[in-house]
Structures are given as structure tokens and as C-alpha cells.
Amino acid sequence: MDKRISIAIDGPAAAGKSTVAKVVAKQLSYVYIDTGAMYRTLTYAALEQNIDIENEEKLMEVLQSIRIEFQQGKDTQQVFLNGQDVSEVIRTPDVTNRVSIVAKHRLVREEMVRRQQELAAQGGVVMDGRDIGTHVLPNAEVKIFMLASVEERAERRHLENMRKGFSSNLEQLKKEIAQRDKLDSEREVSPLKKAEDAFELDTTSLSIEEVVRNIMAIVSEALQK
């Protein structure tokens, strides 16, 4: 199995993309690239500098001045901002509730896509996000579009928040996730949408193991081609 392909996993907020993508990458010994973490890191950096996240020009100045890197830790992938581990702080509700605003800016997305394509150039990657199959890796050999109900996604995010010790309100999360869906699907630049050649996977009633099994079956088929 020497062939190394690119795998694009897209879907709305809290659909379980990152969790599944990490497992798939590990099973294949591929590199996992969390594009959402890149936007989160920029959001965190902008908030730290009190930058108005509606101001694209200011955001671009921040983006050009920062280095975002990934390192594979023992069990998880770590995200570094200018050499500092920000894996946990970019997952706080503060960042989560603002990242869609940062991600809607055209110039920001263009620069992020350039960086993401650079990271994926060698193949052997699993990349997840909102526009991977449609925009970042349009030629990916495997494209997955993960779906789940707002209720299910809010429940997952709620449990994740509780586990991390963040305060969490399930009803509030439902509203926030629905709002992020709206922002992500209606933005002018690379909106969230399923690529025509993507496999759609509704994960509402599936366990992580079942989702991974489904994806690995699709990958195995692609590797035979």
C-alpha cells in the first residue's frame, strides 16, 4: 500500500470531523491537518492583541506576523503559535464563538488555503474543515461530507466542554451552532457545502468507531484504484 492519497473531510461545526480525521490519519500513518485549528489560532492571536476581527486588513497583519505549526504529540496533535503551545486555549468558547467571523474574510481564507495546500503538497494527508473538498483540495482522491443534527452536535460540544472544565449551557450551544451553520453556509468566500463527488455520511446515530470504519472502507477502495 505505497500509494499515498489526500483525504478531505468537511462538515459543519461539531460534526466530529477532527476526532474522526485524527483516527483515520493514525490508522493510515498519514499527516493530519486541522484547518479549523489554523483559523482558531489566528482568532486567538487577534483577540490577544485586541484586534477588531471584522477588520480584514488588521487581521491580515496579524496573520502575516504569526507562524502556525502542528506537532504530533503522544496521543493528540499540538498546535503552536510562534513556538508557544496553544492547543487548549484555542478551544475556549471565546475563540469558538468568533472563529466564523474571522474565517469569512476573503484575504484571510486565500492565505490560509495557500498554507494548507503547501502542507498537503506531498500527499498522505487527512485534512478537515469546511471547504477542503470544494476549495483547498479539489483533487483529493477521497472526499467525505459529515453531517449530524444540531441537537446531536450541541450535545457532543456540551460533553466536550464539561470534560475540559469549561462552563457549558446546552440550549445556548444549540443556538450558537445553528448561528455558526448560518455564517458558514452563507459567507461569500468558500461557503460550507458538499463537493459533488463527496460521500455524505450522517453521523447522528453513529459511534466514532462506526464513522471511522465507513471512511476506511471508502479509503481502501480508493487505494485499490
From Swiss-Prot:
A GO biological process of this protein is:
nucleobase-containing small molecule interconversion
The protein's matches in CDD domains, at most eight in alphabetical order, are given as: CMPK (cd02020)
Q: Name one GO molecular function term.
A: ATP binding
Q: Reaction catalysed?
A: CMP + ATP = CDP + ADP; dCMP + ATP = dCDP + ADP
Q: Which SUPFAM superfamilies match?
A: P-loop containing nucleoside triphosphate hydrolases
Task: Name the positions where ATP binds.
Answer: G11, P12, A13, A14, A15, G16, K17, S18, T19
The compartments listed are: Cytoplasm
| InterPro entries, sorted | Cytidylate_kin (IPR003136), Cytidylate_kinase_dom (IPR011994), P-loop_NTPase (IPR027417)
Query: EC annotation?
Result: 2.7.4.25
Keywords assigned:
ATP-binding, Cytoplasm, Kinase, Nucleotide-binding, Transferase
Q: Which GO terms describe its cellular component?
A: cytosol
Q: Does the keyword Nucleotide-binding apply?
A: yes
Identify the NCBIfam families for this entry: cmk
The entry assigns this protein to a family as follows:
Belongs to the cytidylate kinase family. Type 1 subfamily.
What is the official name of this protein in its record? Cytidylate kinase
Species of provenance: Bacillus cytotoxicus (strain DSM 22905 / CIP 110041 / 391-98 / NVH 391-98)
